[in-house]
């Protein structure tokens, strides 16, 4: 793990690259006489010779339907799930097992799908025990998916109940945080590599894609997908 979180790494990469980082969302991608015009959510228009679209699969079709319909159609076939993460800081000295966590099978009476004992997995920070519980599974409806339908207070209550059930822990957390990832967990079903090949094949030469829905959801796989995307655009520029 990166000390201070991945934000530290991103900030340092931006600093060393000497680039301008505009923290806006792109809402439209259009062809331009010499490349592409990208419109952000503040209405500003950006000109680009080439672009890497590093967005979740559900966002991709709305950006490129008009310029890469084959890619848009392939992206729509990638199913996704939503999840809510509950991070708790428990008082130090709580008797937790020396394991990294627990995966919960569907059908169990726990609401959590996974419990990560963060202090055991990544090392302790201060006099607290950090734990993380995940809620929401692929296949949940919009009404039953915890990430979409449950409030923060409900999630915190479920987390306390699940910790008590699994570990016998009944304490008030020192601190807590709830974060939701909506439609952000791509599902790798049968034939996924062929689907990704079709998705990439439909892109214009100076557009590329990157993200966890392509070649794997882990950090190394995402870095590799981004490197591949950037390299393809460099090659396209050289070919021109």
Feature locations, PLM:
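A structural signal for the hydrophobic beta-strands that form the central parallel beta-sheet
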Residues: 21-22, 53, 209
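Conserved flavin/dinucleotide-binding core of flavoenzymes
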Residues: 114-240
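Short, well-ordered alpha-helix to beta-strand connector turns
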Residues: 17, 48-49, 204
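A conserved beta-strand/loop element that lines the FAD pocket in flavoprotein oxidoreductases
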Residues: 16-28
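Generic solvent-exposed, charged/amphipathic alpha-helical segments
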Residues: 10-15, 61, 65, 156-164
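Mid-domain catalytic core of redox enzymes
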Residues: 27-148, 153, 165-166
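Short glycine-/acidic-enriched loop or helix-start segments at secondary-structure transitions
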Residues: 25, 62-64, 188, 219-220
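Short beta-strand to alpha-helix junction loop
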Residues: 1-14, 21, 147-154
């Amino acid at each position: 793990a990166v000390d201070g979180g991945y934000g530290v790494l991103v900030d340092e990469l931006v600093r060393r690259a000497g680039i301008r980082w505009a923290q806006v969302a792109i809402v439209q991608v259009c062809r331009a006489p010499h490349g592409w015009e990208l419109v952000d959510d503040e209405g500003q228009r950006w000109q680009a010779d080439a672009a890497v679209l590093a967005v979740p699969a559900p966002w991709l079709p709305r950006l490129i339907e008009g310029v890469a319909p084959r890619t848009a159609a392939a992206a729509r076939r990638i199913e996704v799930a939503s999840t809510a993460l509950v991070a708790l800081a428990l008082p130090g000295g709580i008797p937790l097992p020396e394991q990294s966590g627990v995966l919960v099978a569907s059908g169990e009476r726990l609401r959590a799908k996974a419990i990560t004992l963060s202090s055991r997995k990544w090392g302790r920070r201060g006099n607290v025990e950090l734990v993380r519980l995940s809620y929401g599974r692929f296949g949940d409806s919009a009404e039953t998916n915890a990430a979409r339908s449950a409030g923060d207070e409900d999630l915190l209550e479920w987390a306390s109940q699940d910790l008590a059930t699994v570990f016998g822990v009944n304490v008030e957390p020192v601190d807590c945080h709830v974060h939701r990832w909506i439609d952000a967990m791509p599902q790798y079903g049968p034939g996924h590599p062929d689907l990704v090949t079709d998705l990439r094949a439909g892109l214009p030469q100076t557009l590329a894609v990157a993200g966890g829905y392509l070649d794997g959801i882990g950090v190394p796989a995402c870095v590799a997908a981004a490197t591949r995307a950037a390299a393809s655009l460099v090659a396209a520029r050289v070919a021109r």
